[in-house]
A protein has these predicted regions:
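Short alpha-helix in the alpha/beta-hydrolase fold that links the catalytic acid
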Residues: 49-51, 177, 201-211
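Active-site signature of alpha/beta-hydrolase-fold catalytic machinery across serine-
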Residues: 49, 152-156
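Alpha/beta-hydrolase fold nucleophile elbow
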Residues: 132-142
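Gly/Ala-rich beta-loop-alpha elbow adjacent to hydrolase catalytic centers
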Residues: 142-146, 150
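Serine-hydrolase catalytic machinery in alpha/beta-hydrolase-like enzymes
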Residues: 10-23, 28-133
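A conserved short beta-strand
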Residues: 159-171
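Short beta-strand/loop motif that positions the catalytic acidic residue
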Residues: 190-193, 197
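C-terminal catalytic histidine-bearing segment of alpha/beta-hydrolase fold enzymes
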Residues: 203-249
Length: 249
């Protein structure tokens, strides 16, 4: 990484508190920004350790990319998770691990996702203003619920982002996403999901993949043998995906 240690700075972008990580020279402007949103129940900084790992995997990222990790706006203290955050609340049956109708979940628009979308959009707008990067030079992504929100945002921004990274995410808001995705033909998407995911089933991830592919998005789908997690080989593929975004589509 050109001998520079990544620095991590807490700041507020738009409506959300964020952690910003890069290894750029002091005062340098990034050529690409990557916004990654954590999952339901995780602390706001849960994904921050991914930045130095990705920077170490690909030297080009260290020289040219800035990572931004927004914290979700909702607290889960009332559920016994004082440091847990959420982008939107989940139905009680999901929280209790009861049988879930994932086909129905895929069709429904989750209450609260619109507010979560506005929050992430405010981060993207503030980041674009601060770095002078157009939306087309900002990659969006997230893990689990964070992947749902950033998929929703990527399909609704006025301008297409540089790419979308869905890490163990799932399908929701199906009718709206299908309609919006038709305007995102060619958008590069990296999607990874564990075959043994017992939180968000692999079959639902396949339905999301199929929706995006049918709409003409360029999806790199990476299944791995594992549960609801981020696998080492997934990180390697993600790093390569981000390097490709440096060169444009």
């Amino acid at each position: 990484m050109a001998g520079r240690t990544p620095r991590s700075v807490a700041t507020r972008l738009g409506e959300l508190d964020c952690r910003v990580v890069d290894a750029l020279p002091e005062g340098a402007t990034p050529e690409l920004a990557v916004v990654l949103c954590h999952g339901f129940g995780a602390p706001a900084t849960d994904l921050v350790p991914l930045a130095p790992e990705l920077l170490a995997l690909e030297g080009a990222l260290a020289e040219r990319v800035r990572f931004v990790f927004p914290g979700a706006p909702l607290t889960l203290a009332e559920l016994g998770m004082p440091s847990g955050r959420a982008w939107f609340h989940l139905p009680p049956e999901v929280l209790m691990g009861q049988a879930r109708d994932w086909s129905r979940f895929g069709r429904e628009v989750p209450p609260g996702i619109a507010a979560a979308r506005r929050g992430v959009m405010s981060v993207v707008d503030a980041l674009s203003t601060a770095t002078k990067l157009p939306y087309g030079r900002i990659v969006l992504g997230g893990f689990s619920q964070g992947g749902m929100v950033t998929t929703d945002v990527a399909l609704r921004l006025e301008e297409a982002p540089a790419g979308l990274c869905i890490l163990s995410g799932t399908l929701t808001s199906e009718a709206e996403w299908r309609q919006k995705a038709s305007a995102r033909k060619g958008l590069p998407v990296f999607q990874a999901h564990g075959r043994h995911d017992d939180v968000l089933p692999f079959s639902a991830a396949e339905r999301l993949r199929d929706l995006l592919v049918e709409a003409g998005l360029s999806v790199d789908f990476h299944p791995f043998e594992g549960p609801h997690t981020i696998a080492p080989e997934e990180l390697e593929r993600l790093a390569a995906f981000l390097v490709a975004r440096l060169g444009g589509r």
